[in-house]
């Protein structure tokens, strides 16, 4: 069940890890700084291994907490949405997850 997790901080710094199993909820919450929310229309991401179907998570209360804008994550979100216009921005750190079918199902 191999998978990949990419963490993108608000300064654009990326940390990519290969995972043997889906991360635990508590780990994801710690990474985004609170309760997680699925980012709508962010379902694919370009990776060195090609375009990948993905799940992207952010802090569900990030805007109310005045978390800083995440320009890189917002740019990737707009690319993922294709022709669907995104009239919003992502704030705070985000987590991108993708992998084989069993990894994705475990999320």
Give names to the regions the model predicted.
Residues 1-107:
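Domain-length accessory/inserted modules outside core catalytic folds
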């Amino acid at each position: 069940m191999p998978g990949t997790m990419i963490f993108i901080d608000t300064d654009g710094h990326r940390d990519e890890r290969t995972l043997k199993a889906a991360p635990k909820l508590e780990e994801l919450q710690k990474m985004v700084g609170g309760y997680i929310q699925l980012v709508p229309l962010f379902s694919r991401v370009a990776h060195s291994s090609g375009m990948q179907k993905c799940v992207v998570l952010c802090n569900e209360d990030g805007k109310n907490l005045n978390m800083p804008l995440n320009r890189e994550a917002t740019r990737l979100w707009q690319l993922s949405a294709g022709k669907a216009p995104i009239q919003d921005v992502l704030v705070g750190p985000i987590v991108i997850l993708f992998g084989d079918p069993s990894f994705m199902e475990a999320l």
